Amino acid sequence: MREKYRQERDKRSVGRTYQFARGDFSRYARDPYTERQEREPLTDEVDVAVVGAGIGGLLTGAHLRKETGLERIRLIDGAGDVGGTWYWNRFPGVRCDVESYIYMPLLEETGTIPREKYSTGPEIFAHLQQIAHRYDLYRDALFQTTVTELRWDEAAGRWLVSTDRGDLIRARYVAMSIGLMHRPKLPGLPGLETFAGHSFHTSRWDFDYTGGDSTGGLTKLKDKKVGVIGTGSTTIQLAPHLAEWAEQLILFQRTPAAVDVRGNRPTPPEWAAGLAPGWQQRRMENFHALTSGVPQDEDLVQDRWTQTTAKLAAAILPTGDTGGDPKERALAAERADFLKMEELRARIDSVVTDPATAAALKPYYRVYCKRPCFHDGYLQTFNRPNVTLVDTQGQGVERLTPAGVVANGREYPLDCLIFATGYEHEFAVPYTERAGYDIVGRDGLRLSEKWADGARTLHGLQVNGFPNCFILSKVQAGRHVNIAYMLGEQTRHLAHIVKCVEERGHQVVEASEAGEKEWVEEILRLATNDIDFLENCTPGLYNNEGDPSGLPLLNSSYGGGSVEFVNILRRWREAGDLAGLELR
């Protein structure tokens, strides 16, 4: 089986390029949901400018409201509303793949109980809007507004925030939460600009063309041949709805997804009624620990995330002993991984009726080479007579023509082509390039210059030379499948630092040179932990398209695990000495 995995990896190691949705392709990034509203430029001052109004930006605003006396907190976002990922992603079938009771933040604070174990995109979006109302974050927000530069004014102790609307906003603090899924990317295919049919990216869904909404009902596709490039987590949710309405659906696959059972169900009213105060944080931490391989007395979430991790952990450490021969432990992990993937491959055989299609859908790689997918209707889609799987044997689509898509030497005529090809990757694309602006700190130092060879931070949050500036990302910080939980921990930490600055009468805080150096050394010490594993995976997002060593080690997440990262932040706050920071 190792040889089979190697073969599947190697036949995909042909390199894959992407085209960013900019310049001639900028139409793929335009907002189809909110009509642009013109306004006069603003020149004013705020306490905090938060760039990004997704979960990270909202939690920054919420925790600052709760922990500090700062009054004017301004969210700035290019979208037409709050929500981030959940504003942009409205495609039919969109849901979270992490349990909604632990993914949707501040449930207790807002008095919200999700309707299902795995909530729909519209429900999540509405909840994020509720958070913005609850913490009065709409009041000073600027939407449909893109930051063009952040520049520190040393004499005034303020950040100058410039935007594409001509605004000049002075802010004591800036926090950047530009997110993971806001800049769509396209496949770098010959002929991309020549396709004469209709096309769009899944994060800019064109309901005017398809009809329907996020729940389905795509009535305008009844006479359309629709193609989708990409078979990751978006297509897993989307395909059943397209198949229901399109005359013909053609899915172009480079690498099969590993699709496990979702097991969604309505929220039991009696369970919700019996929840004790603090239930959400306890549930989050329980899930966080279990999915990080840290044993717990019980599994509160009981889903495929926790159950799979438990199986792998039990195989490696059957008695809970953390010692033993590392080679034997690695072999045990590989065996358990193989058995889990065999389970998923067997599920395909049990559902998909055509043997050739079933064989093409089988994934041959380790469980966590890619983000696992969960769905109870995707595989069944391939039993429909109007659905065709075009397996490209790892080579990907060859090119586009005015009429359609060429794959495996054959042209597939299409009326509509949908790109489910993901987003600019935060580990591979320089931060300021993804952000779309540069950050100019003390003495004219540009973040693009300081980070030319990779990031340098304290705890992934603050940078020497950039006072009163906070960056939320996974770079040099904790990384976990529940992104919302990690953002919650980071924003609590951010608010704690600002509160300390305010209470102690200081004006400026930044990472010290020594503090930053010490953290960077720790990042580098642990940064190679995943490379051997990722090198044996099929090319994809996690391993830089098959070249994990091509990513700057400085752009790694904290390699000691997300549980330890959260503990590091908590111990730091408890110590109270603000180690690694300079305050003036």
Curated annotation (Swiss-Prot):
The record marks 371 as: Transition state stabilizer. The keyword 4Fe-4S does not apply. Gene3D superfamilies: FAD/NAD(P)-binding domain. Pathway: Antibiotic biosynthesis; pentalenolactone biosynthesis. The keyword Ion transport does not apply. InterPro entries: FAD-binding_Monooxygenases (IPR050775), FAD/NAD-bd_sf (IPR036188), Neo-PentlctneDsynPtlE (IPR054972). It catalyses: 1-deoxy-11-oxopentalenate + NADPH + O2 + H(+) = pentalenolactone D + NADP(+) + H2O. This is Pentalenolactone D synthase. It comes from Streptomyces exfoliatus (Streptomyces hydrogenans). The lineage of its organism: Bacteria, Bacillati, Actinomycetota, Actinomycetes, Kitasatosporales.
